[in-house]
């Protein structure tokens, strides 16, 4: 079953799903802006197109992840994103 989600007044939209190859996941698109997300479980984020400037929990420096790159976010944490252009992603819930 697909589940549609919308955050930050429609600037971030995702579709959640479960499959045998990825497990529980969501795909989505972020418009330009700055966002903070909280996690319940650990997440693996893959940038599909565009780029994300990311500040991970416990870090003091931002890091840019471009299309094809992956970063991991611990569970029970918050991470920050800066998005300069519309960017798509795949989020796997680990």
From Swiss-Prot:
UniProt record similarity statement? Belongs to the nucleoside phosphorylase PpnP family.
Organism placement in taxonomy: Bacteria, Pseudomonadati, Pseudomonadota, Gammaproteobacteria, Enterobacterales
Q: What is this protein called?
A: Pyrimidine/purine nucleoside phosphorylase
Q: Which PANTHER family does the record cross-reference, listed alphabetically?
A: PYRIMIDINE/PURINE NUCLEOSIDE PHOSPHORYLASE, PYRIMIDINE_PURINE NUCLEOSIDE PHOSPHORYLASE
Entry function: Catalyzes the phosphorolysis of diverse nucleosides, yielding D-ribose 1-phosphate and the respective free bases. Can use uridine, adenosine, guanosine, cytidine, thymidine, inosine and xanthosine as substrates. Also catalyzes the reverse reactions.
GO cellular component: a single term: cytosol
Question: Which residues pair up as cystines?
Answer: none
Q: What is its EC number?
A: 2.4.2.1, 2.4.2.2
């Amino acid at each position: 079953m697909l589940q549609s989600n919308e955050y930050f007044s429609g600037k971030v939209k995702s579709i959640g799903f479960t499959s045998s190859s990825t497990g529980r996941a969501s795909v989505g698109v972020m418009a330009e802006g700055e966002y903070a997300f909280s996690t319940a479980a650990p997440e693996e984020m893959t940038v599909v197109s565009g780029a994300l400037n990311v500040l991970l929990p416990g870090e003091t420096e931002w890091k840019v992840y471009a299309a094809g790159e992956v970063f991991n976010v611990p569970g029970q944490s918050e991470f920050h994103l800066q998005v300069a252009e519309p960017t798509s992603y795949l989020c796997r819930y680990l």
